[in-house]
Curated annotation (Swiss-Prot):
EC nos: 1.3.7.7
Organism: Pyropia yezoensis
Signal peptide start-end: none
Gene Ontology CC annotation, any one: chloroplast
Biological role stated in the UniProt entry: Component of the dark-operative protochlorophyllide reductase (DPOR) that uses Mg-ATP and reduced ferredoxin to reduce ring D of protochlorophyllide (Pchlide) to form chlorophyllide a (Chlide). This reaction is light-independent. The NB-protein (ChlN-ChlB) is the catalytic component of the complex.
Family: Belongs to the BchN/ChlN family.
Pathway this chain belongs to: Porphyrin-containing compound metabolism; chlorophyll biosynthesis (light-independent)
Catalytic reaction annotation: chlorophyllide a + oxidized 2[4Fe-4S]-[ferredoxin] + 2 ADP + 2 phosphate = protochlorophyllide a + reduced 2[4Fe-4S]-[ferredoxin] + 2 ATP + 2 H2O
Assembly and oligomerization: Protochlorophyllide reductase is composed of three subunits; ChlL, ChlN and ChlB. Forms a heterotetramer of two ChlB and two ChlN subunits.
Cofactor note: Binds 1 [4Fe-4S] cluster per heterodimer. The cluster is bound at the heterodimer interface by residues from both subunits.
Cofactor: [4Fe-4S] cluster
Enzyme class: oxidoreductase
Keyword line: 4Fe-4S, ATP-binding, Chlorophyll biosynthesis, Chloroplast, Iron, Iron-sulfur, Metal-binding, Nucleotide-binding, Oxidoreductase, Photosynthesis, Plastid
Protein name: Light-independent protochlorophyllide reductase subunit N
Amino acid sequence: MSTAQSDALTFECETGNYHTFCPISCVSWLYQKIEDSFFLVIGTKTCGYFLQNAMGVMIFAEPRYAMAELEEGDISAKLNDYGELRRLCLQIKKDRNPSVIFWIGTCTTEIIKMDLEGIAPKLEAEIRVPIVVARANGLDYAFTQGEDTVLAAMAQRCPLNLKNQSDNTSLKTSPHIPLVLFGSLPDPVVTQLTMELKKQGIFVSGWLPSKRYTELPVIKEGYYVAGVNPFLSRTATTLMRRRKTKLIGAPFPIGPDGTRAWIEKICSVMNVKPIGLEDREKAIWASLEDYISLIRGKSVFFMGDNLLEVSLARFLTRCGMTVYEIGIPYMDKRYQAAELALLKATCDKMNVMMPTIVEKPDNYNQVDRIRDLKPDLVITGMAHANPLEARGINTKWSVEFTFAQIHGFTNARDILELVTRPLRRNLSLSELGWDVYSKQS
């Protein structure tokens, strides 16, 4: 492994495969977030099995997603794509009556060149239900980019004007240029971040995605936009290029330090002087001390899975941990520039070595480095957790951070709850004398 530099972050790129979930898994949280939607995944039996395994518990509740399974006739072009999709969408409209239908393309629709973008406008005009096409297929780098693809497609559907004139007037009387935040977060977290900005005198004009498709925010040229997750670079690019918005390049609101930096950057762009953020951050750090004392001085190694690695590494560095390596499937250095700068500043503040950032890491090489470095914790994808545990290495599934509430000041405790769980478990087992896995001769 390269030695970490004292003056700059070290970037490497290996030739490993992308070891991650399929991005169509984004359906599992987006269909719950957008309440009046229906998601139609167009793929093969493999896609169906994956969705059943990922979301099988919800099938009996008649969820708002379905699988359009491709057959031999589809692949050999014997069946008419328009006719088949029309039949399915009419059935969806009759049974569920959604405000929007999302077509989620898969690897197979890419390979057989199915013209979903060409079919959708014609069918939309016929059945009078908006159809949004998102190619959230397994050719992406990380499963979280499925959400990025869907939000980028939704961004182009955001209205230019509100139908309700009174709402339009309220936007015009806003004390600053309208601000739209993008990223799918649970409703309580959306409320928390909106209120944090409101305390500073900054009003959020809307969120992408909104709770309902019919309530998408107005996005005009010159509006400010800010992301809440590191994996939304495609959405940011779409908003800047297609809607001519101004992106606020801020660290992401993960951990007290990241949340404060995120709010401060938005305040600086809006020419608002932030109030009370330093005291708020100090109070949060003080309340986390019972968790931080468990991990201070410990080491962590990120194998790379969901593109949250840099933000989590920065937060854990601030908690006193040493980060040996940040494996990440893909790094958009422009979109994450502010986050990388905060990571470097945090390492300098804590007087620890700069971690090496490895794009597209080779897992065989990573296992060798883990064996040499012997970190106290490895944050990894589900595929590698059990093999590493069998070798006596503490692990945590990175996918848990995707589904947990980790944004904002108060949710930092949830991050530390996840990080410390394997360490607390092993501490309890050792007290019981159960720290040896195999029978000793």
